[in-house]
From Swiss-Prot:
It catalyses: ATP + H2O = ADP + phosphate + H(+). This is ATPase family protein 2 homolog. Changing residue 285 to T: Severe loss of catalytic activity. Prevents inhibition of air-2 kinase activity without affecting the interaction with air-2. Homohexamer; ATP binding induces oligomerization. Forms a ring-shaped particle of about 12 nm diameter, that displays 6-fold radial symmetry. Interacts (via N-terminus) with kinase air-2; the interaction is direct and inhibits air-2 kinase activity in an ATPase-dependent manner. It comes from Caenorhabditis elegans. The gene is cdc-48.3. ATP-dependent chaperone which uses the energy provided by ATP hydrolysis to generate mechanical force to disassemble protein complexes. Required for various steps of embryonic mitosis including centrosome duplication, spindle assembly, ER dynamics and cell cycle progression. Regulates the stability and activity of kinase air-2, a component of the chromosomal passenger complex (CPC). Inhibits air-2 kinase activity from metaphase to late telophase and negatively regulates air-2 stability during mitotic exit. GO terms for biological process: cell division; ribosomal large subunit biogenesis. Disruption phenotype: RNAi-mediated knockdown causes embryonic lethality. The first embryonic cell divisions have mitotic spindle and chromosome segregation defects, and mitotic progression is significantly delayed. At late telophase/G1, air-2 accumulates at the spindle midbody abnormally persisting following cleavage furrow ingression and into the next mitotic cycle. Loss of inhibition of air-2 kinase activity. Also, causes defects in ER dynamics characterized by a failure of the ER to form a sheet structure at the onset of mitosis and remains in large aggregates throughout mitosis. One of its GO terms (cellular component) is cytoplasm. It is found in: Cytoplasm.
Length: 724
């Protein structure tokens, strides 16, 4: 190993005292004696640096933990050795110059930055661009800062308070703008020099001196907005602010909570409560919280993202802090620390808004004494929302009630999308265009489930007239004639069980029922609810009924309910199925008549259901959907053969009805389809289905309903225990 000392990385030119990299010492001879700004290589001289702006991975992690607002956005990382060459100290203000642009920042040491280079946190200057960094000299402290603001937002005291917090401990130069984000929108702030300062600085180099003058905001300074430019035009700074939350449509419960626990206490000079608010996207959370910020203007600080929360780091001006974030991840330690700091300040009221309360750490949740969920709007809330947005889209007032009735599951955002789409939809009238647009919009409230208003009518189900009437009495009558039930002092059924052989239209009946009743239809199959993760199956049941209540009136259809509701202690049951059944029973007990949620279940094996599920108050009615009788078979066959041509239509249908005794509805449909396939097999151009084709189809499709199943249904109907 050589004993020679390693050459220093930086060398000082003996002629001009410029500091350059050792490898650039020869190239420096071409620029020796010239101003630093003309150098094409990195160098430092007399407090001025000429070097490249480079990228540093996770640069914000090298900043001091209390760097927030302007200080964070305008920090400049620089090597400690480079700082010593320039005679700079940490957090000292410097001017960055690139082309015709210049701005003020503060330096902070970082060993990851190469010698004679800088890493500017702001994206104002692109990476790998040559910049000039120079010290600012004397800085004037200001107790009052006058600015002009350019933004598309309404200027109000809330924004003024945010700017005061953001520009705290900042270094600025007059007529040089600062760009920032507020409520997700761009805001450009330009410091304006007082007229007295302009007059005192008048001289030969007036403009140059004023533009290079650096000022700093003192502790407790005040900001004054001179004028506001909104979308390029000048307007009054402060506009009329709302006094309550009546401008926001819907959200009745959440609005009342905020009025009672936040707004009223503030006006009465009392301490407000911290509130946790959550709800689906498009439900109006952000709109509501922005309105709260306007109502309590001057007392609030609005934080619209985790990034803003981390920037402010708990430093806010108002005593009401609104934190509007979609999700607060546990891994985001800096945001969690900032929120914890806010909640730990007894003088502050925190309104936290998230998408789901379940994802919030329990340590935070217990610190909110009041919680409010913004649910999917009810009919009255939808009507209120339409009254607020109808004028925007020129939607007639007389149609508001009709639209509100038929938009179950629509959030406020969905209703806006509906009226917007209706302007371009097909139809001669407003209502026709709205109905066309509604088919194209999937409501937010029902997206995560298979939920819809099915396009199936009673006419699509052949025969079964008595069965249809019985089901209508159990489901549709309570919706259309509630006064009749009140007159007799009885409650409508909470649940209905459809049982019978496979293929007898139980699912089709359920869909037609939802369509005729104009109710949402939420369909799940029993096995789909099971999960290998402990507790997930029970949570699926809870979520199912929770969403059903939100988008009521709803029919919750459980197909193959025997997979979930099998008798406890039987061979089919297991630990998971028993827990799921217990959760299902709990949810059924919690269904109040005012919830407008009906459980409709279907099974082929009613004998295997747990007796607790079948008691009155849960599955009140058990309706047998049996094999089609002669009249029903005729109706089904006539419906399925409408487009078929026969040699003798009447005789063919009569023969089919006679020969399909014991066939289910699905098997009758299969017979018709198979006969048509045999006709096409003989000739692809065939137009008539012969009786011989039906004979072949009857031989291929046979009745598969076993006799022991029919005995089970008879025993169940009579209340006898089955031996099967």
């Amino acid at each position: 190993m050589s004993s020679a000392k390693k050459k220093p990385s930086l060398v000082t030119c003996p002629q001009c005292n410029a500091v350059v990299l050792t490898k650039d010492s020869l190239r420096h001879q071409d620029f020796c004696g010239k101003p630093v700004v003309e150098s094409e290589i990195a160098c430092a001289q007399n407090g001025t640096l000429r070097g490249f702006n480079v990228a540093v991975d996770k640069a914000e992690g090298f900043l001091p933990p209390d760097a927030v607002g302007w200080e964070k956005e305008h920090s400049i990382l620089i090597n400690q050795q480079t700082m010593e060459s320039l005679g700079l100290l940490a957090r000292q203000p410097v001017r960055i110059i690139h082309s015709s642009d210049s701005f003020i920042g503060i330096v902070w040491p970082c060993k990851e930055v190469a010698l004679l280079k800088v890493s500017i946190i702001s994206s104002r200057i692109a990476r790998e661009r040559m910049i000039t960094l120079e010290s600012c000299g004397r800085v004037e402290k200001l107790k009052s800062l006058s600015v002009t603001v350019k933004t598309s937002l309404t200027l109000n005291p809330a924004l003024s308070g945010f700017l005061e917090a953001y520009l705290s401990h900042s270094y600025l130069q007059y007529n040089s703008s600062v760009d920032l984000k507020y409520l997700g929108q761009n805001v450009t702030v330009t410091p304006e020099e007082p007229i007295e300062s302009k007059m005192s600085a008048m001289g030969i180099d007036d403009d140059k001196k004023r533009n290079s003058k650096v000022v700093s905001t003192a502790v407790g300074y005040k900001i004054q907005i001179l004028n506001a430019s909104a979308e390029g035009s000048t307007s009054d700074v402060l506009q009329t602010l709302p006094t309550d939350l009546s401008n926001i449509g819907g959200c009745f419960t959440a609005k009342q909570v905020l009025e009672d626990y936040v707004i009223s206490p503030v006006r009465q000079k009392e301490s407000p409560c911290s509130v946790l608010i959550w709800g689906l996207p498009g439900s109006g959370k952000t709109l509501l919280l922005k309105e709260v910020a306007l109502v309590l203007s001057g007392s609030t600080t609005y934080i619209g993202s985790c990034e803003e929360l981390m920037e402010l780091n708990g430093v806010t001006t108002g005593n009401i802090v609104i934190v509007d974030v979609n999700e607060l991840e546990k891994e985001n330690t800096k945001a969690n620390r900032a929120l914890s700091f806010l909640l730990g300040d007894e003088k502050k009221c925190v309104i936290l808004c998230v998408r789901s309360s379940e994802t919030l750490d329990i340590g935070f949740r217990v610190r909110f004494p009041i919680e409010a969920e913004i649910t999917v709007p009810t009919q009255d809330e939808r009507l209120d929302i339409l009254s607020k947005i109808g004028n925007i889209y020129n939607f007639p007032l007389e149609l508001h009630l009709d639209v509100a009735r038929h938009t179950h599951g629509f959030t406020g955002g969905d209703l806006c999308s509906l009226l917007k789409a209706a302007k371009f939809a097909r139809g001669r009238t407003h209502l026709e265009r709205v109905n066309d647009a509604r088919k194209r919009i999937r409501p937010t409230g029902i997206r995560q489930f298979i939920l819809e208003v099915p396009n199936v009518s009673w006419n699509d189900i052949g025969g079964n007239e008595e069965l249809k009437l019985e089901i209508q009495q159990a489901v549709i009558w309570p919706q259309k004639h509630p006064e009749a039930f009140e007159r007799f002092g009885i409650d409508p059924p909470a649940g209905i069980l459809l049982y019978g052989p496979p293929g007898c239209s139980k699912t089709l009946i359920a869909r037609a029922l939802a369509s005729e009743a104009k109710m949402n239809f939420l369909a799940v199959k029993g096995p789909e609810l099971f999960s290998k993760w402990v507790g997930d199956s029970e949570k699926a049941i809870r979520d199912l009924f929770s969403r059903a209540r939100q988008v009521a009136p709803t029919i919750v259809f459980f197909d193959e309910i025997d997979a979930v509701g099998s008798s406890r202690g039987s061979e089919k049951s297991s630990g998971v199925s028993d827990r799921v059944l217990a959760q299902l029973l709990t949810e059924l007990d919690g269904l109040e008549k005012s919830s407008r949620v009906i459980l409709l279940a279907a099974t082929n094996r009613p004998d295997q259901l747990d007796s607790a599920l079948l008691r009155p108050g849960r599955l009140d009615r058990a309706i047998y959907v049996g094999l089609p009788c002669e009249v029903t078979r005729r109706a089904i066959l006539e419906m399925r053969t409408k487009k078929m041509k026969f040699d003798d239509t009447v005789r063919t249908i009569d023969k089919l009805v006679e020969k399909t005794s014991g066939y289910s509805g699905a098997e009758l449909v299969a017979v018709c389809r198979t006969a048509a396939m045999f006709a096409m097999r003989e000739s692809i151009d065939a137009t008539i289905v012969q009786w011989t084709h039906f004979e072949q189809a009857l031989a291929a499709v046979v009745s598969r309903t076993e006799a022991y199943l029919l005995e089970i249904y008879d025993d169940f109907k009579a209340g006898r225990a089955s031996n099967a």
